[in-house]
Amino acid sequence: MESILIVSGTRPEIIKLAPLYHELKRQPWARVVWLHTGQHAQMAEQIMGSFDIRPDLTLVRQGDSLLDFSLGCRAQLEAVLTGERWSTVVVQGDTESAFQGALAAFYNGVPVAHVEAGLRTYNLRRPFPEEGLRQMIGRITRFHFAPTARSRDALLSEGVSKQRIWVTGNTVVDAQQWACEHRGIHRRASGRGHMLVTMHRRENWGQDVEQVCRAIAQIARQHPELDVLFPVHLNPVVRGPVHELLADLPNVRLTAPFDYLEMQQALADAWIVLTDSGGLQEEAPTFGVPLLVLREETERPEALEAGCAGIVGTSTDAIVAHVNRLWNDPAEFRRMQRAGNPFGDGTASRQIVRHLAAELGVGHSSAVREQADVVA
């Protein structure tokens, strides 16, 4: 029996690790332990409940600052990892929880499995601190599960052996398929649908948020028949200017942040998405919804190459121009709508489990390794 520790801390990690957790739980050779670090304590219980997950271990968050959290998390993870023999530690993405989980595993000689490996902008300030964290995780990872060929190529360029990289697709698509099947997510809106807007990234705080809000206000006034749905981040740095500039517009609805299932339903009913979220760049194409990225660069260029997304930055004029182009050009809108999802087909979790089984010496390892070499 192989003991596998899954480390999660934030909403996106839970979403993307949930389908892998359920797939691992079905394996007779795996003992799976879900550990939650408490990084996003308020959101965790609800989102885990949405995926029928009850954590086996929950760390006690110490202090409010990132430094306090990191120190407390590291010490508690050390106790967990030294308490028994682990076959591998699974982390996802580029959060502080993922980094601390990977670092604790590395120090204790436990192989790290990194889900969503190889995303890069090579700009340590954008996104901050995620770009630095994922690069550091990449240096100490044994099993790199890259969502796309581009992510694999980034790892190869950094000197990672191709024998340690598997292109699996992104588990976020698996999670969406699970939600559609088990929670009844489907398009319910009639007509065009709404414009869905989200913003939360640290690099967009301040003037960038204000510019985006001015663009939304201009679009809402130009198109009074278009409903704008904006679940607003709780951080006052974001919440303040959003409410100041948009609260009085009759066709703009400002809400509290959505839970996962609410966001999936909002995506299914959307005409277009404006966001700085990485996760939504991966999710919107599943529902055939064009997306405009409110950033200057993205670590998910596959969406741009496929044609289902475009980068507009945070310039008021650029945002308004891009939205109006899609409003006035049905052919361009349909092209983006029909581009498909370049991030996977919903089988990523099954592929990851097969490859882990091969590397850990259980299951049909030779067949899996042969298939992995073909993919790589």
Over which residues does each language-model region extend?
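Nucleotide-activated sugar donor-binding and catalytic core shared by glycosyltransferases
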Residues: 1-230, 236-376
